[in-house]
Regions:
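Secondary-structure boundary/capping micro-motif
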Residues: 1-209, 219-226, 240, 247, ...
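SAM-dependent methyltransferase
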Residues: 212-213
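Conserved, non-catalytic sequence blocks in retroelement Pol enzymes and Pol-derived host proteins
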Residues: 227-231
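Catalytic phosphate/metal-binding cores of nucleic-acid and nucleotide-processing enzymes, i.e., regions
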Residues: 234
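P-loop NTPase motor core of the ASCE superfamily
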Residues: 237-239, 246-255
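Charge-patterned, long linear interaction tracts outside catalytic cores
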Residues: 253-267
């Protein structure tokens, strides 16, 4: 398409200063997808309205670049998320404490995402350094809790989970099968006897909510980055960004809004 014809296509919207500024802020700073931007603007009934197709055209044509990227930074189009292979591989068996409840025994309310308080648990580690992130994601709201621990062992993970959930009343926890969750019985006793339900080995889709959220975290904390020097305040900031990002599966509400049952002005 000739550039003049392309500019005629986007001029009514992305060449509007207010619309351009809003789209650029939400896409570049908060990493919202074009769909999230478009449908959240509609959800909040903003006077600024733009289709996600128009935003995609602007991205792929480099219209949102405007020379704002620092040397070595990825181009805007490469910020669009693409799914890769899961990190779990067959042939590796972990040792852990006795598994008392299988995921097939998990209450139907948890399976159907009918209530707040059913959590999925995992860790996010790097290939360098011993530190890792312990992540908890509420199944209904997709609300994320995240805390860094000095090393990926059962004691550190136990302490982090208890710390993150001590002020709530979790109903169930579905963790990864790794040995770092071997102290699940101790966690259960500390959290009002919350029940753990373990998935099948090497089937991360049984904890798909957490796996997807960990993928979003990887955008901020790549696998090659040593987490040891990452400040807790930065982790909290990135978790807040994800918790305030609208989701299609939540009818364009954010996890924060669903978890706390409130409405926010995010745009």
């Amino acid at each position: 398409m000739p550039i003049t014809a392309y500019l005629q296509l986007i001029k009514p919207l992305l060449l509007n200063a207010n619309i351009y500024k809003t789209v650029q802020l939400l896409f570049l700073q908060y990493q919202w997808s074009p769909e999230q931007i478009s449908f959240r603007l509609k959800h909040e009934k903003k006077p600024i309205q733009i289709s996600y197709a128009t935003i995609y055209r602007g991205i792929y044509r480099g219209f949102l670049e405007e020379g704002k990227l620092s040397p070595g930074q990825r181009g805007v189009a490469r910020k669009l998320r693409h799914r890769g292979e899961t990190r779990h591989k067959n042939g590796c068996i972990e040792t852990r404490g006795k598994i008392s409840h299988h995921i097939s025994e998990r209450p139907e309310q948890a399976n159907q995402r009918e209530r707040i308080g059913d959590w999925e648990a995992d860790t996010v580690a790097s290939v360098t350094g011993k530190a890792c992130l312990v992540t908890l994601v509420d199944r209904k709201s997709r609300y994320l809790l995240c805390e860094k621990v000095a090393k990926k062992d059962s004691i550190s993970v136990k302490q982090a989970i208890i710390h993150m959930l001590k002020d709530s009343r979790p109903k169930t926890i579905t963790p990864d099968r790794g040995k770092e969750f071997s102290r699940h019985e101790e966690i259960s006793k500390a959290l009002n006897d919350v029940q753990f339900y373990f998935p099948e080995p090497h089937q991360p889709w049984q904890r798909g909510t957490n796996e997807n959220t960990n993928g979003l975290l990887r955008e901020y904390f790549p696998k090659k980055q040593d987490l040891t020097e990452i400040k807790p305040s930065l982790i909290r900031d990135k978790a807040l960004i994800l918790n305030q990002r609208p989701r299609k599966c939540l009818n364009w509400k954010s996890p924060f809004e669903v978890y706390f049952n409130i409405s926010l002005h995010l745009t």
